[in-house]
Amino acid sequence: LNFLSFSTLAFDEAGGAHNPTQIARALARRGHRVLFVEPQPSATRNAEHLPFEIVALTELGLTPTQLRRAWFGLETEEPETVGHALLERFAKFLPNETRIAIFSAPFDPFVRLVPFLRAHEFLIVYYAMDDFAAAPALGHTQFAPAAEDYLVRDADVLCAVTPHTARTLERFGKTAHVIPNGIALETFQTRKNARPAQIERGELTLGFWGTLIDSMFDAGLVAHVAQMRPQWNIHLLGARDPEPHRPSIVARLKQFENIFFHGAAPHEELPRYAAACDVMLAPFPDNAFTRGRDPLKIYEYLAAHKPVAASYAPQLTALPYVFVAQTPDEFLATIERAAQTRVEEHALDVFLEQQSWDARAGALLETVRDITPQARSGGEILPTFADPDAQTIMRYAEMLERELEQTQRWARELERGAQMRGGLKRFLPSRAKRN
């Protein structure tokens, strides 16, 4: 089979541990050919000598400005150039056999290509990584509700990572298959004997890794733990939220002496940090988006043979050594319970082997077996699904102003350097002096 995989995450983001990259790799390892489409070029593109090729939207004709506008949920020009460039790349890379396009998120520049792809005999699969119907309320403007509605109605096959998200996809009467996330065990198996990271230990040492975004990380819950258990140390690994309009996790928690920020760590270093911790944390906020998630970090924590204390995610209770709380005080008790739990490593490894990405790819292949693409007339590019509100437009304008200020600072530095060397006198416009 030939797959076209659309991902809003870069191929190498989070060390390539995320669903779209791992599913694409697993399909390629099974001998299927895969063309992976990411927003902009990854820093690393290791295809492991597999029948696998990676291309970015910006390499297919979408300008950086158009991509940035799409990320803010604003209208972009018709991506017809992208569609033709993509088809040309696809035709060169893949033979003329069964064609399957996988969409992992309702991103406007991707979804608008659906009729164009149908006209070229693609089967359309929507494999939802999250409950994107709940995403806009949390400020994730790149996922348009109308784009997801279109995908849900038009896709030949619907899949989701949790039963909750599958139920949201079934709102128009179709059946959705549940295919959870998986785990790349090799990262953790090859580093089992690595020395633990040298971090400040407490009576209990708690760890977390992931992006520090308020829609996915309950800072108030972690503050409660830090305040009620000052003898415990909490270590947070992850990049800060780049969006200034959202509450800052770091600003909220930096007052606590028993909370330590380590920034983003290479994915291959995560086992060392886990080895230094007693319990790993998944402090999710209480919202619909949380209830639709199947967090990769949970599988990674388990692969490191660590018990997990999570919050507001009842879908995780079926996983071994994952303890889920529904209130702040329950979260404290859950951490203590997890710390007292002895992990049976062999039994856990047997369980995790069944959660491999190869198994997930096999389940996906079963869902598309014997499915015939819906016959549709026309192959036009869809109009934009963007419908930004005033707040979104203001955030975009503020971002442009920040970039302008950064550019002006850069120009002033160049100007000063040039003046010192007797070069050009001015890069920036200046007002004429009054007499």
Model-predicted segments: where are they?
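Nucleotide-sugar-dependent
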Residues: 14, 18, 213, 266-273, ...
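Membrane-proximal helix-turn-helix segments that form the acceptor-binding/catalytic region
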Residues: 140-158
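Carbohydrate-associated surface elements
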Residues: 164, 179-185, 191
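Conserved donor-binding/catalytic core segment of Leloir-type glycosyltransferases
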Residues: 198-216, 222-226, 235-237
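Nucleotide-activated donor-binding/catalytic signature segment of Leloir-type glycosyltransferases, i.e.
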Residues: 238, 246-271
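A charged, aromatic-enriched C-terminal amphipathic alpha-helix characteristic of glycosyltransferases
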Residues: 340-373
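Boundary detector for helix-to-coil junctions that initiate low-complexity/charged tails
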Residues: 374-435
